Amino acid sequence: MKKKYLLASLLAILAAGIYLYYFHARIYQEISKANLKSPDKNQTFLIGADMDFQKNIVYAALGDSLTAGVGVLNYEESFPYLIAGKMAQDGKKVTLKDHSIPGAKVGDLKDKLVSAAIADNPDIITILAGVNDVHGKVSLAEFKNSYGAILKRLTEETDAKIYLVSIPFIGAPSLMMPPYNLYIDWQTKKFNSVIKALAETYKAQYIDLYSPTAAQFKTNGAHYSPDLFHPSAEGYAIWAKIIYG
């Protein structure tokens, strides 16, 4: 009897593992099929240049494909550009420096982007990163160490005001099927708790993007681009409004 119970348990675990592996692979197959590209980026944009503003704000945006604007055709529809536009409307000339690598994990930002961002001598920095760590099964400890190393350098080597944007839930239900969607949601919350704690440690401002958008982004709709993972122009506009406040 015990042997039968043990065998049944092992088979159930094996079946669950195969199921999760299949849907994990399927997600990336579907995203790849959409073949979305990053919009053309000059990496530097000047917003409000035609206006007579005395103050020029340098805004450095660090992140992955979500900062690069994957899902839209023009970088002007990305959330960093939309935020820079809102700053200009408030009477500031803004130099936007895009520092993003689609597919990047936080460790990649640490190794490849931070030095360039520091060289910009920015006044404002946003970091939206971690979704690839969540999906890439990076450990919480590694994530915390890499993110902390980024913040240590930014706080020591710049005078910028730093905004840490929480990892949003992304993945339409037709792409992220249960129970994988539940697992990703659970992991996202855990990683966000690390970001929030780091914000307190390094005196950065934490912006909760997860809570006000999770319900909507757990549904299909026009807020998603064709790959059902990256936001559309409508989705990025929602994010920009929340991030800018």
Q: Whereabouts are the PLM-identified features?
A:
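Serine-esterase "nucleophile elbow" of acetyl-processing enzymes
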Residues: 32-100, 115-121
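N-terminal secretory targeting modules
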Residues: 1-60, 244
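Oxyanion-hole/transition-state-stabilizing segment in secreted/luminal serine hydrolases
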Residues: 106-144
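Surface-exposed cleft-lining segments at the edges of enzyme active sites
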Residues: 69-70, 99-106, 131-141, 178-184
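Active-site-proximal beta-strand/loop segments in catalytic clefts of secreted hydrolases
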Residues: 62-64, 99-102, 128-131, 165-168, ...
